[in-house]
Each structure stands twice: as structure tokens, then as C-alpha cells.
């Protein structure tokens, strides 16, 4: 059965008030809304020693990612000209710029490939199902349509072979896009229960795809799929898990985005421990690891 996730549910992110308690080799970046104003969004950064600071501000930030050159990209939407999506670029040195635009769209997931191209999923404001268009932005900002999804789509992630995966919550399907843009179904609705829709995506070093699911809080789950699509449950008992990211040591970090206010970042270690990495957050969404800035 199709389950439609209303966009307004995910227009709220939050500022981090919690303090990281574990140090890691790379910094952890988190997109945060703060409130429902154009000025409330920000990106927080945790240093390897666990110190948190605000890296940047941006209206309605969502997906975040680094490329191989150390450029940091943010999927942002300007609500003053609703909806106007923009991919923001933060180089290792220099000033913020706009890599590209997507008019009348709300941007969600974002990912980069090894060639430095940026992929962002834009939810069409005129579509009743908020159908997704995956735009490809070349390093010079040239925009092309890489692919489409039938319904509201959240997370994007690349596997090691250069295939792009997209979590379509409306169709309850994970779509796989070959490097040439050919779309196939990786797993469909039968891979999920009637109370699960896919949201965040992250690959581990073995090529397994981790999928956060929404719709059954406070007993939401993270599922894991092998490269051939065989699924199993990684963990349950979560509250609205969304963005995920692995650190260099293979620990999984998950943002719990509580719609009524609050949220945290959980760490699942390779030893099987579940740790609250940061608490007291107000609706965190997407995560990524990258070099200190």
C-alpha cells in the first residue's frame, strides 16, 4: 500500500544543543533547520575532539556531501520564492557560491560521484505526489536531468560501482540508477512492512545498503540489504530516523528527527554498541563525514 509523506512533516530541522561525546578521525556535518523561517537553517560541524560549531547558515538545508576535492555541497531551498531549490558550494578556501538552481522545487537528498558531479533530488511543487527529478550538476554548474522518481524521494547514495540509489517514500521503493541513468527497481514495497517507508540511505564498506524507515515511531527500523537485494533488520525501536552516514572506522551514525521537537544522533559501533552521540537536537536531518573546515 502506498503511503504518502506530507512535505510539511519534513520542513522542520533543528539547531544542535547537545554535545558530541565521541571523537572521530573526520568531522561530522549535520544539516539543521532551527525553525520554520528562511533564516533559521544551518550546518553544524563536530570536530574530531568532539567540539561542535556552526559551519554555515542556509535556508532549509537538506542533503549534504563532500566531493573528492574537499568542496562541500548543500541542498537548500529558498522559501522566500517558494519553492526555489539551490545547490550551495563551499570550497576548501574562498566564499560560498551557488552551483545550480532548481526552480519551483524543494531539494532533498544530495550525493556526489567520483568525477565531482553533484546529484540532487528536487521535489516538484506542481506534482500531487511530489514526484522527484534527480538533477546532475557538473563541476562548472551545467545542469542536466539524470533521472526521475514517481513520488516523494528523500535519500540518495552511490555504491562502489557508481550506481545511484534513491529512496522513494511514496512508492515505497528503492530505485537504482546505472551510470547512464537507466532506472531499475532495487527493492520494492514487498521489502517493507505496511508501516515502513524508506528515507535515508548509506552504504557500508562491503556494499550493503542501509535504509532508515519512517512511519512507525517510536518503533521505526533500519533495514540492511545485500548487493543482491536480500534484506534483514539492522535495528528497531527508533524514533523517525532519517539521514545516516558511516565514519572511516565503519560506525553508523543516524539522525533521529522528531517531528514534535527534539532529536538526536545515534552511533552504532562495529562492536554492536548503541551510543547517543549527541542529544537535545531540534530535528536533525542529513549527515556526512568530511575533512575539518
Tell me the role of every PLM-derived stretch.
Residues 1-6:
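N-terminal secretory signal peptides that target proteins for export/translocation
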Residues 21-25:
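Sec/Tat signal peptide C-region and signal peptidase I cleavage site
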Residues 38-41, 58-78, 83-84, 102-125, ...:
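Beta-rich, blade/repeat-based domains predominating
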Amino acid at each position: 500500500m502506498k503511503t504518502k509523506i506530507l512535505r510539511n512533516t519534513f520542513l522542520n530541522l533543528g539547531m544542535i544543543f547537545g554535545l558530541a561525546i565521541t571523537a572521530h578521525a573526520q568531522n561530522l556535518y549535520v544539516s539543521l533547520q532551527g525553525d520554520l523561517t528562511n533564516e533559521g537553517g544551518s550546518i553544524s560541524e563536530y570536530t574530531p575532539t568532539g567540539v561542535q560549531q556552526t559551519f554555515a547558515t542556509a535556508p532549509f538545508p537538506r542533503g549534504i556531501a563532500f566531493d573528492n576535492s574537499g568542496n562541500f555541497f548543500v541542498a537548500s531551498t529558498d522559501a522566500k520564492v517558494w519553492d526555489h531549490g539551490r545547490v550551495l558550494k563551499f570550497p576548501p578556501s574562498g566564499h560560498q557560491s551557488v552551483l545550480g538552481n532548481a526552480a519551483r522545487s524543494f531539494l532533498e537528498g544530495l550525493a556526489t560521484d567520483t568525477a565531482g558531479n553533484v546529484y540532487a533530488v528536487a521535489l516538484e511543487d506542481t506534482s500531487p505526489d511530489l514526484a522527484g527529478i534527480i538533477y546532475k550538476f557538473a563541476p562548472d554548474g551545467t545542469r542536466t536531468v539524470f533521472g526521475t522518481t514517481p513520488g516523494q524521494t528523500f535519500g540518495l547514495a552511490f555504491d562502489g560501482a557508481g550506481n545511484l540509489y534513491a529512496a522513494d517514500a511514496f512508492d515505497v521503493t528503492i530505485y537504482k540508477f546505472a551510470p547512464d541513468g537507466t532506472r531499475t527497481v532495487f527493492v520494492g514495497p514487498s521489502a517493507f512492512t505496511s508501516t515502513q517507508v524508506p528515507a535515508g540511505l548509506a552504504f557500508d564498506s562491503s556494499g550493503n545498503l542501509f535504509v532508515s524507515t519512517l512511519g512507525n515511531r517510536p518503533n521505526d527500523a533500519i533495514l540492511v540489504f545485500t548487493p543482491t537485494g536480500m534484506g534483514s533488520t539492522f535495528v528497531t525501536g527508533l524514533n523517525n530516523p532519517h539521514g545516516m552516514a558511516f565514519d572511516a572506522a565503519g560506525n553508523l551514525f543516524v539522525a533521529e528527527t522528531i517531528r514534535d521537537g527534539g532529536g538526536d544522533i545515534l552511533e552504532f559501533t562495529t562492536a554492536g554498541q548503541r551510543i547517543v552521540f549527541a542529544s537535545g537536537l531540534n530535528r536533525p536531518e542529513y549527515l556526512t563525514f568530511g575533512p575539518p573546515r
